[in-house]
Amino acid sequence: MTIAHLNLLRRSGAAREIVRYKAPMPTGALKEGVIVDDYDMVCIVPRSFSPTDRAEDTEAMERALSAYASVGLTPEPKKTFFGQDNADFWGATIQGEVSRVRAHREVTVRTMTLVCALLRQRKATARIWNAIVGLAVYVSLYAWPALAFLDIVFHEADAYAPGEVFVPSRKALAELASWLAFVPFMSVDLRAKVDTRVFATDASSRSCAAVVTRLPEYLVRELWRQRPRRGVGQRYAGAADNLVDDASSACVGSEAANTQGDEAASTWSAELCNAVGWEPVFKYSVQRSEHIDTKEARPICTLVRQLACEVRSEGLRVLDLSDSSPNVGAWAKGRSSSGRLGPLLRRVAPDQLLTDLQIAVLYVPTSANPADNPTRGRRVRRAPVDTERSALADALLSGRFDSLTDASFRSSTLQAPPLSVLLEPVAGPPYPDDICGTS
């Protein structure tokens, strides 16, 4: 039904900028989406705009109404809203006035009430326990670091029948209490700026380190849009049949897992890292006996702590490059089921939530990781590796995002089929991009 609804809209020129589950967000000011019979959109407009001013969403709505009229349908007035600053849809509460998005307000309040009651009673049936944990995960969807507070709660009721009453362990209750304390901070700042500083971290047997470079803002925004996401398979070795999902346990990570990407042809991240120079940020020793996954996580945690200490008045989006596939998956998911990585992510979750810090860890092959040198006692590479940029690196650094860059991004992830395979082509001209001026 969703496909049929989208095709109907596209025949009239609407549903052009579609938000897809687990896919990068559209680049335009207008974001459209369809879930069964609901057609919703979000449009970024200047602060000075009023609900009556025309913008891209005005044109989209007119085309959508024309599409419905063509088949004799009329939207129900009680369920039709337009030009709203604040709205609840797609399972979220969008607060346009303060530019934040969070889980649905009513569900959030109910979840907090249930958790408080559970902490007072200290007993529950397995069915109620699992329902509360499911609600807690939903509330955390717009604040992935909050999931790091939850670990043993996911299996606390496994040994009990659905209607059987049991007493949760102190550790499980403590996890819920910690999670509850941070619920007011579980939202996303939609106006958060991207940091043009791009970091890279690495670890060896004896030390870990971080380096930094500066990239154009338009490139950082595009890399942020293409960042790893929870539930989206990442291709680390370049082959179509060698995919690692971010939900894979970090305990399978090893030095070999970190270097598997070196066997493949150069990725976009490798070419980009080799095309710019880098500066040192920090370096310190780690225990030789420590597992490589936690060694790789430590410099990321240190970086989070340092960024959280910076004074700023709004949220910040930061990119970090790492050759550790378990860490790429764990940081995209917000938590790790591994007993190794979980505690490290939990320690820095408050730093991210309280300071509106959003961090994305992108994969780079070990051979191109600029943070590898300082971990092995060598100088940081301050100049580009090649005197001439590759075609891909030049396109990225110049902001020419075309079929070449898109294909490179797609090759690093397991994405859904393109819209051209699923939907009919869009009829009519694009939405006018000069309706609302700059946004």
Can you say where each PLM-predicted feature lies in the sequence?
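Nucleic-acid-interacting cores, centered on viral/eukaryotic replication and modification enzymes
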Residues: 1-439
